[in-house]
């Protein structure tokens, strides 16, 4: 549920609890990522999930649905995205002003439904075996709210990592 008000601690706890239950039952990575995005939507107006592919990140999915459809498959070179590159290299969350609305980001922001860079974004890494495999990019530009759920999104990101690691282990068990 994408909202235009800050979520209460109870709403975030309820979404996290539901996500944890769902991750235990997740059958594949798409389902695990969908669970993450649904829980992230409690605190964020928009979100995009990128997959790291060497020197580029590629949009995998996002919310709301219009963003997902507009951006699916869009690639951004890390050399043109210092904030995303910094998250990948440092394995830390970034919270701050959105990358400048020029070059590849101009098209990216149009896909998000805006012409200018968001005043504030959050970019969270998703790690498996200490390697960043993907990043979540979220903002509240439509409502103009500041991002106050950094801890919540970090917890979601860590739980997603665990869920993906369990899925990898299940696959290895079946292959042996």
Q: What does each of the following model-derived ranges do?
A:
Residues 126-136:
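Short hydrophobic/glycine-rich mini-motifs in sensory/regulatory modules
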Residues 140-154, 167, 171-176:
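Regulatory loop-to-helix N-cap segments in sensory/regulatory domains
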Residues 154-161:
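Allosteric cytosolic regulatory segments
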Residues 119-127:
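Short hydrophobic beta-strand micro-motif common in sensory/regulatory domains
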Residues 1-22:
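Signal-transmission linkers at sensory-effector interfaces
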Residues 68-107, 173:
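Regulatory sensory and allosteric helical modules in signal-transduction proteins
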Residues 15-23, 28-44, 49, 160:
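Amphipathic alpha-helical coiled-coil segments that mediate homodimerization
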Residues 49-71:
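GAF sensory/regulatory domain recognition
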């Amino acid at each position: 549920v994408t909202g235009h008000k800050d979520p209460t601690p109870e709403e975030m706890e309820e979404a996290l609890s539901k996500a944890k239950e769902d991750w235990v039952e997740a059958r594949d990575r798409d389902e695990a990522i969908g669970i993450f995005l649904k829980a992230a939507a409690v605190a964020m107006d928009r979100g995009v999930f990128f997959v790291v592919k060497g020197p580029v990140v590629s949009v995998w999915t996002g919310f709301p649905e219009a963003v997902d459809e507009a951006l699916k498959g869009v690639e951004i070179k890390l050399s043109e995205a210092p904030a995303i590159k910094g998250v990948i290299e440092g394995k830390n969350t970034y919270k701050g002003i959105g990358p400048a609305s020029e070059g590849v980001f101009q098209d990216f922001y149009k896909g998000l439904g805006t012409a200018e860079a968001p005043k504030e974004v959050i970019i969270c890494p998703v790690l498996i075996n200490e390697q960043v495999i993907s990043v979540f990019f979220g903002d509240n530009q439509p409502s103009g709210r500041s991002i106050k759920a950094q801890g919540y999104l970090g917890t979601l990101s860590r739980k997603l990592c665990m869920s993906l690691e369990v899925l990898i282990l299940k696959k290895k068990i079946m292959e042996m």
